[in-house]
Amino acid sequence: MPKYYEEKEEDKHPCAGVKEDLKSCLLQTDCVLQEGKSPKECLKEGYCKALQVTFFECKRSILDTRARFRGRKGY
């Protein structure tokens, strides 16, 4: 489920909810907090893999002409 913040402006871009959740997931991992690695390095190591796949599918559905009629995947 996406996390909503009252004081934050709503992003109108496609896949913004998934992107925000992926970013917050990466910033809360032990890889970033304790080991001091960058979120990019932690993403390559496999942290938050489900959200990464969901974000990829959402971005791909923007370009896929068949999926454009069915709607974007993700939230």
Swiss-Prot record:
Motif residue range(s): Cx10C motif: 31-42
Motif, Cx9C motif: chain positions: 48-58
CHCH domain sequence ranges: 28-66
Keyword Ribosomal protein part of the UniProt annotation: no
Disulfide bond annotation, renumbered to this chain: C31-C58, C42-C48
Annotated Pfam families: Pet191_N (PF10203)
Function recorded in the entry: Involved in an early step of the mitochondrial complex IV assembly process.
Family the UniProt entry places it in: Belongs to the PET191 family.
Protein name: Cytochrome c oxidase assembly factor 5
Organism: Xenopus tropicalis (Western clawed frog)
Source species taxonomy: Eukaryota, Metazoa, Chordata, Craniata, Vertebrata
